[in-house]
Each structure stands twice: as C-alpha cells, then as structure tokens.
UniProtKB/Swiss-Prot annotation:
BP GO annotations: myoblast migration involved in skeletal muscle regeneration; positive regulation of lamellipodium assembly; positive regulation of macrophage chemotaxis
Localization in the cell: Secreted
Keyword Disulfide bond assigned: yes
Residue positions with a glycan: 48, 71
Pfam families: TGF_beta, TGFb_propeptide
GO MF term set: cytokine activity; growth factor activity; heparin binding; identical protein binding
The protein's assembly and partners: Homodimer; disulfide-linked. Interacts with WFIKKN2, leading to inhibit its activity. Interacts with FSTL3.
Gene assigned in the entry: MSTN
Protein name as it appears in the record: Growth/differentiation factor 8
Main location: secreted
UniProt site positions, description: Cleavage: 98-99
Length: 375
C-alpha cells in the first residue's frame, strides 16, 4: 500500500512539473497537415497548368506542320488581312470555344489539323505569264492542304472600286494559256454583268471550282488569270494591284475542302474549379491567351479554354477500368499506378497565317480537354 501511494505522488509531481496538457494540440497539428496538403495540391496543379501551356504551344506548331511560329508583325497583318465578307464573317461570328462537355463523348481524331477553309492570296508566278507585254493579276499557288483534299467550293473574290454615278459593269475572268498559233493567250472562265450604285465599292465572288480542279490535275496549266471589270467608259474598276489606301482589297481565293467526322464513345469525369479541395482526378479550367504568347499570326481566336487534368488516381477511384483494380489487388508491387489524363479531347477552329503568308481556316484536333480520368 505504501508503494502505491509513492507511485501516485510521483505521477502527480510529473504532471505538475510538465504543466497542463494542451487538448487542442492534436487538432492544430491536424489542421496544419491539412493546410500543408492543400498547398501541395495547389502547387501540383500549378505545375500541371504550366506544363499544359508549354505542351499546347508545341502541339499547335506540330499539328499545323510549322517548325517555328510565323514571324508576322501586327503592321504586316493589317496589310495582308483582306477586308472581304467571308473573312469578316469568320472573325465577327467566330465560335471561339464550345464547352459542350455534357455530351460525354470521346473523339477519335487525327493528329494533324483538318483544314476546312483556305484563303490564298495572289503571288508571283515562277513562269511569269504576260498579256500585251504587261504582267497581269493574278497567280495563285496552292498548298498541300488543297492539293491532297477534295475541293467542295472555290470562290474568287474581287473588289470593285466605287462609282460616282449608276453604272453597268462588265466583269470578265480570263485564264491565261500558252500562246496558240493565232496568238491567243487567254480563254474565258466567267463573265457577268453588274449594276452598281454610286457610293462605296463592293466585293464580288465568282465560282472557279472547275478551273481550280483542272489546275490541281494539271499544275503546268496554271499560268494565272486576268481580271477585268470595265465600266461604260472602259475603265477597269477591279482592284488587282492595290494603290495607297486600298490595303486589304487584293483579290483572293476562298477554297473549302472536305472534313470527315468520326464516331465517338461514351465517357464521364469530374469537373472542378481552382478553389476546389477535390483530391481525385479532375478537370480544371485553363484559358490560353495567344496574345500573351506574342503569337500575332493567329487571327482568331485570340484566346480559348483549353483546360487541364490534375489529381490523385488511387485504385479505389478507378471506374473506367475495374479490371485494373483486381490486378493491383493480386499483385500490388508489380502493377503500375494509374495517371490522371484526358479521356475526351475536342478540336478548336482556328484562323491563322501560315509560313507563306496564306490565311488558313482549319480545325485543330485534340486541343481542348473535355474529360479527365484515371488510366
């Protein structure tokens, strides 16, 4: 009994010397750990975001088959950018980004961009065709995007200078050919008559699909065209070689090629915001700003929602591949852990200058993360 009393006295002495026990110590440590964990998650997401931005730059150049970003200044763009209706409509009504992730489909697309519309500006011919000893507009070179795709539409756009009085204008599009025995150097493509009212000039489009298809089959026959738009006094109103103040009024070709859609399959995933405390694999918002990159050669969109994936992929979270969970349970050391990656990607439409100062309107696959999952 005396030994027990001594033990109790010693125990009480230790408590007094050690001081009172802080009952909140464990909760504070737990709170610190939780905050530290959240900070680590934020840092991990920031690293994923930075990596995604750098990957997007590389992907865009690669998918557009560009070794480097075209070096085109803003001043040059103002000079080269046509002021024509089809291009203005593309810019004004541009569908910057669809975020229809609710459809839950996984797109199987090709790696490289699928071109929908190519706007080609006139250039100088390697074999300069001349009529009456004067070079005539216009000669067009065609990229592989046009050469190796099915052309569904080809329009020649020309700008007619304004008139002071109501005038009837006779428009002729002539195709240059090799000299014939009788000296003929051209053959007609299309003729039309227009009634113009005084005031502003107008843009006129002309169907040249048949001619373009012939040029693609026989490239040596492409010697260029001559454009005439004569008023009643014989003055040519067509802008072929723009004068000062007529920048952006050059003739150009608008060519549309086919785009074959592909089938898709179903998939689902989590959506989060930057303030989310979700630890599982999730899709987070990310806006790409091309102006911040200094990429003035991209006409539209100037920015788009790309999104990125981040989060943990524990085996218990796996729903897409349940067999993976069973494999891990059978051999936990021999099976690699899953990663948080995109499971649904969608394309963006882009209007841009290529390395040859041609304006391209195309679809770039796999640029938007619509779903994230563990795989």
């Amino acid at each position: 009994m005396q030994k027990l009393q001594i033990f109790v006295y010693i125990y009480l002495f230790v408590l007094i010397v050690a001081g009172p026990v802080d009952l909140n110590e464990n909760s504070e440590q737990k709170e610190y750990v939780e905050k530290e964990g959240l900070c680590n998650a934020c840092l991990w997401r920031q690293n994923n975001k930075s990596s995604r931005l750098e990957a997007i730059k590389i992907q865009i150049l690669s998918k557009l088959r560009l070794e480097t970003a075209p070096n085109i200044s803003k001043d040059a763009i103002r000079q080269l950018l046509p002021k024509a209706p089809p291009l203005r409509e593309l810019i004004d009504q541009y569908d910057v980004q669809r975020d229809d992730s609710s459809d839950g489909s996984l797109e199987d697309d090709d790696y490289h961009a699928t071109t929908e519309t190519v706007i080609t500006m006139p250039t100088e011919s390697d074999l300069l065709a001349e009529v009456e000893e004067k070079p005539k507009c216009c000669f067009f070179k065609f990229s592989s995007k046009i050469q190796y795709n099915k052309v569904v539409k080809a329009q020649l756009w020309i700008y007619l200078r304004p008139v002071k009085t109501p005038t009837t204008v006779f428009v002729q599009i002539l195709r240059l050919i090799k000299p014939m025995k009788d000296g003929t150097r051209y053959t007609g493509i299309r003729s039309l008559k227009l009634d113009m009212n005084p005031g502003t000039g107008i843009w006129q489009s002309i169907d040249v699909k048949t001619v373009l298809q012939n040029w693609l089959k026989q490239p040596e026959s492409n010697l260029g065209i001559e454009i005439k738009a004569l008023d009643e006094n014989g003055h040519n109103l067509a802008v072929t070689f723009p004068e000062p103040g007529e920048e952006g009024l050059n003739p150009f070709l608008e060519v549309k090629v086919t785009d074959t859609p592909k089938r898709s399959r179903r998939d689902f995933g989590l959506d989060c915001d930057e303030h989310s405390t979700e630890s599982r694999c999730c899709r987070y918002p990310l806006t790409v700003d091309f102006e911040a990159f200094g990429w003035d050669w991209i006409i539209a969109p100037k920015r788009y929602k790309a999104n990125y994936c981040s989060g943990e992929c524990e085996f218990v979270f796996l729903q897409k591949y349940p067999h993976t969970h069973l494999v891990h349970q059978a051999n936990p050391r021999g099976s690699a852990g899953p990663c948080c990656t995109p499971t649904k990607m969608s394309p963006i439409n882009m209007l841009y200058f290529n390395g040859k100062e041609q304006i391209i309107y195309g679809k770039i696959p796999g640029m938007v993360v619509d779903r994230c999952g563990c795989s």
